[in-house]
Swiss-Prot record:
Binding residues for ATP: P123, T124, G125, S126, G127, K128, T129, L130
Domain of life of the source: Bacteria
Top-level taxonomy: Bacteria, Bacillati, Actinomycetota, Actinomycetes, Kitasatosporales
Gene: clpX
Signal peptide (UniProt feature, chain positions): none
Name of the protein in its database record: ATP-dependent Clp protease ATP-binding subunit ClpX
HAMAP family (UniProt xref): ClpX
Length: 428
């Protein structure tokens, strides 16, 4: 058996060009050589590709209770919505699993399971988008967010509905097979309600027209998607994607829908036997809890569209206590994020309870919900985030209620003469 280098020639790796003296091992093939470093690199590339193309492992599909508990770690409150989403998502991917495995039934006996697309009602900043994002993160499936207000019917200025699918394909790194089991969240769907309950004789290209265009992809169809987005034209290739197993979560604030619900419920509650509720009871109750498909049709959604969203659930306005929990309790809570940012500069950041209450009150006053908390935190911490990184004498920053209410400077606690902060112990 011939040994490498017997002829006296200095052999090199055919891939990186390094000589046998520069590497640990040089493996010979028919007319080629590869070094141990190139082998390691090839293994890393293969592992990355396998990780990227890994699909949901259906045999390990989490149960509804496990999905709910995962959501609990990121989303505060909204128990009813989390429970409904957990069940709907589990049933959807169980349906996908049954479709891939044949469900253990012959083709003649097979029962076709319908899709469980979800309609999520609730005010802005109440956690609709976060719920959808968290579900996708747990299941390790591609996730895309689309804004319904940018969509128009095909042939008019604006985005075609197929561009929603392109975002999902891009999220899956153009792995169409993987994208076909992803989740799409369409926000602001209430903004495409038709102008009146009755069908219009004029073209409503950004309202009813969008709902009509969404029907097919919601139900399940093979759509042709332009790979670069934009409008379709005959001289381009298309990506074919089957939306049968794509889960659609459709959300919107539906401002004014509560009045339609009240008027319907009020018509049934007239007379001596009617249940009378105080204003306080009505405010504390989830305003969309009693929603019916007929209310959504009166709001301006077409019946065919509502029919393709069998799971209807809602999130409610966040009160002060819920906002306080959002600030400190979730795994990626805002207070924890800012404390980590200051920690990277070697500084502790503390919030007094009254300061957190003041931040929550500001969010309620601005009617921005949880989404507005970060903006308020940025305003409160802007001056100290500008000042502290340049100062080596600051050990701790304390945020009080006056900092939030009156825009006074935060309390800066200096280090001692040896450079220790007040909470640091002397080491032997």
């Amino acid at each position: 058996m011939a040994r490498i280098g017997d002829g006296g020639d200095l052999l090199k790796c055919s891939f990186c060009g390094k000589s046998q003296k520069q590497v640990k091992k040089l493996i010979a093939g028919p007319g080629v050589y590869i070094c141990d470093e190139c082998i390691d690199l090839c293994n890393e590339i293969i592992e990355e590709e396998l990780a990227e193309t890994s699909e949901v492992r259906w045999e390990e599909l989490p149960k509804p209770r496990e999905i709910y508990e995962f959501l609990e770690g990121y989303v505060v409150g909204q128990e009813a919505a989390k429970k409904a989403l957990s069940v709907a998502v589990y049933n959807h991917y169980k349906r996908v699993q049954a479709g891939e495995n044949g469900g253990g039934q012959s083709r003649e006996d097979a029962i076709e399971l319908a899709k469980s697309n979800i309609l999520l009602l609730g005010p802005t900043g109440s956690g609709k988008t976060l719920l959808a994002q968290t579900l996708a993160r747990m299941l390790n499936v591609p996730f895309a967010i689309a804004d319904a207000t940018a969509l128009t019917e095909a042939g008019y200025v604006g985005e075609d509905v197929e561009n929603i699918l392109l975002k999902l394909i891009q999220a899956a790194d153009y792995d169409v097979k993987k994208a076909e089991t992803g989740i799409i969240y369409i926000d602001e769907i209430d903004k495409v309600a038709r102008k009146s309950e009755n069908p219009s004789i004029t073209r409503d290209v950004s309202g009813e027209g969008v709902q009509q265009a969404l029907l097919k992809i919601l139900e399940g169809t093979t759509a042709s998607v332009p790979p670069q987005g934009g409008r379709k034209h005959p001289h381009q290739e298309f990506i074919q994607i089957d939306t049968t197993n794509v889960l659609f979560i459709v959300g919107g604030a539906f401002a004014g829908l509560e009045k339609l619900i009240e008027s319907r419920a009020g018509a049934k509650g007239i007379g001596f036997g009617a249940t009378i509720r105080s204003k306080r009871e009505l405010e504390s109750k989830d305003q969309f809890e009693d929603v019916m498909p007929e209310d959504l049709v009166k709001f301006g959604m077409i019946p065919e569209f509502i029919g393709r969203l069998p799971v209807i659930t809602s999130v409610h306005n966040l009160d002060r206590e819920a906002l306080l929990q959002i600030l400190v309790e979730p795994r990626n809570a805002l207070v924890k994020q800012y404390q980590r940012l200051f920690e990277l500069d070697g500084v502790e950041l503390d919030f007094e309870r009254e300061a957190l209450e003041a931040i929550a009150d500001q969010a309620i006053l601005r009617q921005t919900g949880a989404r507005g908390l970060r903006a308020i935190m940025e305003e409160v911490l802007m001056s100290v985030m500008y000042e502290v990184p340049s100062r080596k004498d600051v050990a701790r920053v304390v945020i009080t209620a006056d900092v939030v209410h009156s825009n006074v400077n935060p309390t800066l606690i200096p280090r001692d003469a040896r450079g220790r902060g007040p909470g640091e112990q002397k080491t032997a």
